[in-house]
């Protein structure tokens, strides 16, 4: 697995050269061709594929399949929202994408928590799943079972997924407890490229 701080050069050695960006008139067909190619590559890949990864997963192939599904879903939401269209996600899919965010992305970041660790309980009502995200000064960890939480977020998997990717307002889910923890979340748990 690629370590963010030590293996960046090694990671980019595997990164494919990106094609030239298409003209606006060709963008939709370019995207469809790229999507078709991605699906074919993932379907044709052997189950024991060895390649660079950056998230914990059962296998490199499962990591990249899951990552690309989530990446496409969240940016589909962004594109549709720019046109005033509300995206819908099937509960099981949204639950899996939420699980990727909370168990793979969030724990790999730098410690951001307060001096006294705080726990956010994320409860997906439609999939009956629970995640307990504890933020502290030394690490952030996610467990599937827990006890007392400082803040509980309750909603559908899709609404939680969008909230925790910082796409929708806090009012989109039910919150019980220390809602100031959402300021910590919004300020620290997001993808940054610099």
What is each of the regions a protein language model found here?
Residues 1-9, 55-111, 160:
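Short, contiguous alpha-helical
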Residues 1-50, 85-97, 109:
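Short, helix-capping/interhelical loops that line the mouth of catalytic, cofactor-
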Residues 25, 29, 63-66, 151:
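A generic "alpha-helical surface" signal
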Residues 35, 72, 157:
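Short amphipathic alpha-helical/adjacent loop interface patches that line ligand
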Residues 49-55, 141:
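Conserved catalytic-core motifs characterized by acidic clusters
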Residues 98-133:
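A glycine-rich beta-turn/hairpin centered on an aromatic-Pro dipeptide
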Residues 123-152, 156:
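Acidic/His-leaning functional-site neighborhoods
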Residues 146-194:
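C-terminal interaction segments
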